[in-house]
Regions:
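Periplasmic c-type cytochrome electron-transfer domains
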Residues: 5-439
Length: 439
């Protein structure tokens, strides 16, 4: 195997000229390296609203009231700790960083009593929807070189509050851990044309990989658009993603979602005078939160010249990881802000859906995404997860406790890459993991 001693110039620039060189505990919360003065001011204001706890209304703190009446978290940063990912559990109970999407077989509107997402908290005088307990089943898997690893599979128990009525007997719940936010503005700036160029929904090239776009209804434009955010690519852009998170995670209404999303049984039980009119967050503050997200920079790759990292880069491509985790994309010329335009980026994602097999399936359909299909998560910044968030919980529900465990959970379209990884020598495995941890 041949490789150059030194990385190509600029290879560490994961976000082009937006890249920041910070590998410390605040690596995920840095503004774009090329941020303008006006966007820096908006970034600072947006950061304040992202991190501060919202309070119940009415309150003397009118700029931050409107929490609930049903909610899951009090702030954006409660789940996205330091702009990173959440942790799935706290002993046997689930943490704030893990939420649950709800569904009923054959329907796309959620549970008729509890709605589309479980609200574990509520305002005074209002009943929460319930809680979830979790336990893990361990199983051992082997490698060709006789090494073994232990994988854990979560089992969830819904403890529903019958105050609003009993949920559907076939209720499904999909755990969703909060994702890291680095570089999301750059991902938003990748054109639909670029994303669709990598799609192959019918696997016409016969390589076993069938990246599929998800098309969703955009509540702001009132149009069917390409999804790119969320675990199942169910949000079109950062405005709709942010508005959905405000509403479903915190019960905060916005210009995009100006009314609470209650089920009919909840409307009968909740005092509707608690509901704000106009929306809890106005467009000016909302746009600053969106600008904050758009201007979060991806950290640079580390140790790009390390021989082990170089070998791992080659192996990443050789065993098929890069078929879905596409290393390089380019942003378009019509990005929301100038700093994001025409940037060569290295997010290691195609922003498309892939069938990952029954082992990771939750049965919940989301627009065109089936219960076993997931959007390829970006890998930039993954090696700093432990430094920033103090854990290495990966995949949509945080079941994987390491990058290796995440690889071993790959099924469906990821099966071949998992098999190829399992057959690597211990030294080659170390090189591959060193490369991924350098991102």
């Amino acid at each position: 195997m041949h490789f150059s001693l030194f990385a190509e110039p600029g290879v560490e620039l994961s976000g082009g000229s937006t890249t920041v060189f910070n590998a410390g505990p605040n690596a995920f919360g840095m503004p774009l390296a090329n941020i303008s003065r006006s966007n820096r001011r908006a970034h600072v204001v947006g950061n304040s609203f992202f991190n501060k706890n919202w309070v119940f209304s009415p309150s003397s703190t009118t700029a931050r009231d409107g929490l609930g009446p049903l909610f899951h978290a009090r702030s954006c940063s409660s789940c996205h700790v330091k702009d990173g990912r959440g942790a799935p559990t706290n002993d046997s109970s689930t943490s704030i960083g893990l939420l649950f999407r709800l569904s009923v077989p054959g329907k796309s509107s959620g549970d008729p009593v509890l709605g589309v997402q479980l609200a574990t908290k509520a305002a005074p005088g209002v009943e929460p929807e319930g809680t979830v307990n979790v336990r893990y089943e361990e199983k051992e898997v082997g490698f060709d070189n006789l090494k073994t690893a232990s994988l854990r599979k979560p089992q969830y128990e819904l403890i529903a509050n019958d105050h609003y009525g009993k949920p559907h007997t076939e209720i499904q719940f999909g755990p969703r851990i909060a994702q890291q936010l680095v570089g999301v503005g750059l991902l938003e700036a990748v054109t639909d044309k670029t994303i669709l160029a990598n799609a192959d929904p019918n696997d016409e090239d016969g390589d076993g990989i069938s990246g599929k776009p998800n098309y969703i209804f955009n509540p702001e434009s009132k149009k069917r658009e390409l999804g790119r955010f969320g675990w199942k690519a169910n949000e079109a852009n950062l405005r709709t993603q942010t508005a959905s998170a405000f509403l479903r995670d915190m019960g905060i209404t916005s210009p995009i979602h100006p009314i609470e999303d209650f089920t009919e049984p909840q409307k009968e039980k909740i005092n509707l005078t608690l509901i704000a009119n106009p929306p809890d967050i106005d467009d000016s503050k909302f746009e600053r939160v969106v600008t904050y997200l758009r201007t979060l920079a991806p950290p640079a790759q580390r140790n790009a010249n390390d021989p082990s990292v170089k070998r791992g880069d080659i192996l990443f491509n050789k065993i098929g990881c890069s078929k879905c985790h596409i290393p390089t994309l380019r942003t378009g010329s019509d990005a929301a802000i100038d700093e994001l335009k025409n940037q060569p980026i290295k997010p290691y994602t195609d922003l498309l859906l892939h069938d990952m097999g029954e082992g990771l399936a939750d049965g919940i359909q989301d627009s065109l995404a089936s219960g076993s299909e997931w959007r390829t998560p970006p890998l930039w910044g993954i090696g700093l997860t432990k430094t920033v968030n103090g854990n290495t919980f990966f995949l949509h529900d945080g079941r994987a406790r390491s990058i290796e465990e995440a690889i071993l959970w790959h099924g469906g379209e990821g099966s071949e890459s998992r098999k190829n990884y399992s057959s690597l020598s211990l030294d080659d495995k170390d090189d591959l993991l060193n490369f991924i941890n350098s991102l």
